């Protein structure tokens, strides 16, 4: 049940989200969007819930405390002004306290947050395409896919993406994942991965 009336943010709002549960690359995609906006002369501000963080109300991130804000939040804050909080309306209002010309809000994982209206919505996907998936718990869909989105971002170097037509005529953009190997000593190491779908890391 929706408890609040949806409102427009004081600035243009771009949402990066997904229909499926688990890691689909939302955070790096949101960071990329913010980087492109910055290159074009805009002042991006990240809005993020702060998964696993302990902060209860919307807060402008001012430290690298992953316990308080969540690790994804701290990653964003290294590059752009970031506001963490479950209440996206409150976070959007708080953005007025941040400096910058031509502000644009970038929501990391905001597709299921209906209280804040979006001007442009991007859906990330990988592996099993969302239109072929099923609702939880049988599949990984968080909600029934709808056409109230503006673009689909797909990881190209997953099997089958090269020859699949875009869903419902919505523009689809593909990208290739680049694996970067860091050279160093030949000592054994330990890899720790905290994403939902660790196959890419492994």
Question: Where would I find each of the regions flagged by the language model?
Answer:
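Walker A (P-loop) phosphate-binding motif
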Residues: 2-62
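Short beta-strand/turn micro-motifs composed of small residues
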Residues: 17, 48, 125, 153-156, ...
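Residues at the starts of beta-strands that form the adenosine-phosphate
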Residues: 42-44, 120, 150, 171, ...
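Conserved beta-strand elements of the Class I
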Residues: 43-47, 105, 123, 188-192
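Phosphate/Mg2+-binding loops and adjacent switch elements
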Residues: 53-165
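GTPase G-domain guanine-specificity segment
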Residues: 161-167, 196, 200-201
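Canonical P-loop GTPase G-domain recognition
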Residues: 168-181
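Redox- and metal-dependent alpha/beta enzyme cores, enriched for Fe-S-associated oxidoreductases
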Residues: 178-202
């Amino acid at each position: 049940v929706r408890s609040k009336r949806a409102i427009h943010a004081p600035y243009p709002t771009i949402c990066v989200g997904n229909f499926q549960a688990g890691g689909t690359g939302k955070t790096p995609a949101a960071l990329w969007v913010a980087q492109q906006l910055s290159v074009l002369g805009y002042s991006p501000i990240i809005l993020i819930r702060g998964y696993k963080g302990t902060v209860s109300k919307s807060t402008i991130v001012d430290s690298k405390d992953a316990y308080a804000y969540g690790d994804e939040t701290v990653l964003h804050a290294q590059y752009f002004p970031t506001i963490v909080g479950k209440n996206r309306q409150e976070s959007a209002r708080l953005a007025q306290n941040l400096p910058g010309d031509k502000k644009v809000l970038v929501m990391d994982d905001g597709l299921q947050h209906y209280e804040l209206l979006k001007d442009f919505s991007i859906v990330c996907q990988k592996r099993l395409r969302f239109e072929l998936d099923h609702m939880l718990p049988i599949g990984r869909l968080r909600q029934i896919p709808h056409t109230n989105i503006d673009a689909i971002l797909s990881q190209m170097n997953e099997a089958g993406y090269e020859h699949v037509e875009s869903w419902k005529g919505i523009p689809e953009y593909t990208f290739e994942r680049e694996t970067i190997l860091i050279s160093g000593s030949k000592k054994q190491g330990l890899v720790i991965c905290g994403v939902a779908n660790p196959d890419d890391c492994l």
